[in-house]
Amino acid sequence: MAVAELSPCYQTQIVKPPHLSWLSNNHKLNLLGLPKASRITEICCSLAPNQVQTPVAVPTGAQSIKPECYGVFCWTYDLKKEEETRSWKKMITIAISGAAGTISNHLLFKLASGVVFGPDQPIALKLLGSEKSFHALEGVAMELEDSLYPLLREVSIGIDPYEVFEDAEWALLIGAKPRGPGMERADLLDINGKIYAEQGKALNAVASPNVKVIVVGNPCNTNALICLKNPPNIPAKNFHSLTRLDENRAKCQLALKAGVFYDKVSNVTIWGNHSTTQVPDFVNAQIGGVPVKEVIKAQKWLEEEFTEKVRKRGGVLIQKWGRSSAASTAVSIVDAINPLITPTPPGDWFPSGVYTNGNPYGIAEDLIYSMPCRSKGDGDYELVKDVIFDDYLRKRIKTSEEELLAEKRCTAHLTGEGIAVCDLPAGDTMLPGEM
């Protein structure tokens, strides 16, 4: 085994304690009781597979490694000299908030393995946590380090979105405060809305100007709208709220009722808000290329039981499992990314919570509302025009629209539209899994 000789770079610097080396300067100053910083001479070396290079002195003022990087990911990979990577694409940067949470714990390893962006797409993961979750975030980074994913070229962790979101091309915003006992929906809108307003500003300041944003933290539709309103330099079409888990649940229920495998179910739309006002659309859905209503000839089941099963699935899962749906949510995030980077099959579509301006359905503008989309696989999408509406569908689409308009009024102070007025509809419409 070759051993590299380490020679000093003769660049003296102040080194903070290693367990705090990824914190922003502001947060370092705010923490009390820190071990005293020490002054050392920097040692540097460069490693590449099957090759040990002679250490080279770093010129004065040069930065050898980013202070936010983690462990083995701090070393420079020489992609030009790695035979297996010559056909790889240019590395993309993915930022994830709530990265120490259970959803992210399932998602990050899917991203790192290549099943999301492809077997020739190297990625950098930038993980955002909080002061409270920072040690857990270090643990996540350690597990990624130990997993030896060849496509995972960089991992960095931090608690400042203005640092973590830098150059991000995808932002998966999962972090949000859960709804606690006695908390009203208006309270949750305000608390999480402030988080997403700040993250929107951070994206605007430091992310790629064409960053694609998927909001998962609830209430995700209005959180996505708030996030959209705060970065004026990012196209509104780039913001999505997660609907895919609801779509997957709807496909599952239709497949079970029809006695077929779920891959036979297509053209499923979830209209509206991610709440109990959501509208699983069986009018346009198909099974084996045939309209659902011609396969499942049970109108009452479709209008009542099917819709309730989809809406309440998360609550039933909690009763059985004792926890919310983290793994299936992570899968649904992957499923939400896939149709944006893969051309939509002819005749099919996928739902996503997107900006309503210019929509062909008559839905109020300036909302994030789940609607049917098609994509050419370039990260962009267009709304589907050839959909059928009946009175049942229109009435329920309108109800969900009114709820989102009320949520928008309740968060006007976070979107720059004036004083908030909370006149949310009576009754609790939050999905059971959000509580």
Swiss-Prot record:
Disulfide bonds join C69-C74, C410-C422. The gene is MDH. It is an enzyme of class 1 (oxidoreductase). Its EC number is 1.1.1.82. Keywords: Chloroplast, Disulfide bond, NADP, Oxidoreductase, Plastid, Transit peptide. This is Malate dehydrogenase [NADP], chloroplastic. GO terms for biological process: malate metabolic process; NADH metabolic process; oxaloacetate metabolic process; tricarboxylic acid cycle. InterPro entries: Lactate/malate_DH_C, Lactate/malate_DH_N, Lactate_DH/Glyco_Ohase_4_C, Malate_DH_AS, Malate_DH_NADP-dep_pln, Malate_DH_type2, NAD(P)-bd_dom_sf. Substrate binds at R179, R185, N218, R249. It is found in: Plastid, Chloroplast. Removal of amino acids 57 to 76 results in the formation of active monomers, a shift of the pH optimum from 8 to 7, the loss of oxaloacetate inhibition and an increased maximal velocity. The chloroplastic, NADP-dependent form is essential for the photosynthesis C4 cycle, which allows plants to circumvent the problem of photorespiration. In C4 plants, NADP-MDH activity acts to convert oxaloacetate to malate in chloroplasts of mesophyll cells for transport to the bundle sheath cells. Belongs to the LDH/MDH superfamily. MDH type 2 family. One of its GO terms (molecular function) is L-malate dehydrogenase (NADP+) activity. The active site is at H274 (proton acceptor). It catalyses: (S)-malate + NADP(+) = oxaloacetate + NADPH + H(+). Chloroplast NADP-MDH is activated upon illumination. In order to be enzymatically active, disulfides bridges on the protein must be reduced by thioredoxin which receives electrons from ferredoxin and the electron transport system of photosynthesis. The keyword Oxidoreductase applies. It comes from Spinacia oleracea (Spinach). Homodimer. Residues 1-45 form a transit peptide. Pfam families: Ldh_1_C, Ldh_1_N. The keyword NADP applies. NCBIfam families: Malate-DH_plant, MalateDH-SF1, PRK05442.1. GO terms for cellular component: chloroplast. NAD(+) binds at Q199. NADP(+) binds at G98, A99, A100, G101, T102, I103, S104, N192, V216, G217, N218.
